[in-house]
């Protein structure tokens, strides 16, 4: 009997504290309400917005709806798994609740944001897919790290950070390739969006170290940290990006792909190198000179028909 009680006591000692789990659940309900409001507001705004901006509001409504579903699941204490932690800094609790539904939310939302941002400046589909693949790779590796109880979790964490860094580097390259042809205000707006996205994303890695990684912060601390990042990344960012489009002017985000094949971009002036345009101009000049020469030729005498 005593052995059973001692064994059950050991199990209870290893499980997360019920009080903290209840507090974090209540907090998840509050964040769920915020995302639910965003999921309702963005579609309504898209109805009364310009046709050019309706697509963006639909993107933001999808982000809010996915986040709303994820936080509803976490508030109901579903979509989680208890994982033994090799490092315990919080009240000697060596079992950590890992909400894998949170990573499913990121697997959907982060690629959507990447597609929306790069589609705005006319990045090609293949280059967008290249960035999205590294984003998915980073999130899957981070999920594998969270579900791993051995020190090998840090290897998965390193792989995830490498994927994040490659996605960041490629976004910078795409900014120089595509956004450099835009007007100054549009170029700065796109750069601000990329910096905002990746700075918040970097904070996710810091939060992961403190929660799933080293088990430093409590479940309620993890809930607050992650929810603030989610609100800024998937909620506030939509309103800020929409305001930026109104401030800069969506017409200033000219897509390089909308330029006919063989033509130069509007940013190319007459002193820039544009072989196709130069060849077309030379052909037009040659045609004009030919018509002038033909018109200056003496007319041949006509024969009188008797």
From Swiss-Prot:
Membrane topology field: Multi-pass membrane protein
Segments traversing the membrane: 28-48, 59-79, 103-123, 125-145, 154-174, 190-210, 224-244
CDD domains assigned: 7tm_YRO2_fungal-like (cd15239)
Signal peptide residues on this chain, from the entry's feature table: none
Cellular compartments annotated: Membrane
GO CC field: plasma membrane
Gene Ontology BP annotations: meiotic cell cycle
Keywords of this entry: Meiosis, Membrane, Transmembrane, Transmembrane helix
InterPro entries cross-referenced by the UniProt entry: Arc/bac/fun_rhodopsins, Yro2-like_7TM
Coiled coil residues, start to end: none
Purpose of the protein: Has a role in meiosis.
Family named by the database record: Belongs to the archaeal/bacterial/fungal opsin family.
Protein name: Meiotically up-regulated gene 73 protein
Organism: Schizosaccharomyces pombe (strain 972 / ATCC 24843)
């Amino acid at each position: 009997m005593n052995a059973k009680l001692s064994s059950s006591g050991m199990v209870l000692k290893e499980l997360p504290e019920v009080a903290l789990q209840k507090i974090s659940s209540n907090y998840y309900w509050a964040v769920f309400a915020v995302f639910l409001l965003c999921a309702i507001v963005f579609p309504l705004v898209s109805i009364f917005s310009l046709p050019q901006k309706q697509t963006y509001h639909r993107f933001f409504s999808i982000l809010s709806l996915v986040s709303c579903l994820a936080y509803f699941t976490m508030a109901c204490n579903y979509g989680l798994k208890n994982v033994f932690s090799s490092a315990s800094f919080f009240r000697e609790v060596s079992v950590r609740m890992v909400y894998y539904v949170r990573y499913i939310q990121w697997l959907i939302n982060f690629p959507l944001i990447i597609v929306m941002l790069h589609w705005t400046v006319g990045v090609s589909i293949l280059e967008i897919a290249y960035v999205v693949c590294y984003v998915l790779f980073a999130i899957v590796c981070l999920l594998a790290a969270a579900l791993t109880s051995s020190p090998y979790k840090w290897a998965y964490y390193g792989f995830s950070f490498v994927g994040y860094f490659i996605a960041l580097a490629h976004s910078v390259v795409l900014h120089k390739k595509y956004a450099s042809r835009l007007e100054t205000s549009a170029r700065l707006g796109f750069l601000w969006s990329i910096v905002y996205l990746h700075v918040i994303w970097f904070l996710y890695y810091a939060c992961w170290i403190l929660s799933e990684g080293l088990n430093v912060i409590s479940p309620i601390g993890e809930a607050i940290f992650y929810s603030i990042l989610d609100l800024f990344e998937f909620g506030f960012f939509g309103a800020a990006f929409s305001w930026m489009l109104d401030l800069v002017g969506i017409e200033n985000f000219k897509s390089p792909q909308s330029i006919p094949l063989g033509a130069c971009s509007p940013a190319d002036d007459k002193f820039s190198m544009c072989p196709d345009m130069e060849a077309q101009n030379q052909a037009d000049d040659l045609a004009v000179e030919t018509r002038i020469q033909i018109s200056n030729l003496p007319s041949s005498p006509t024969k009188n028909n008797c």
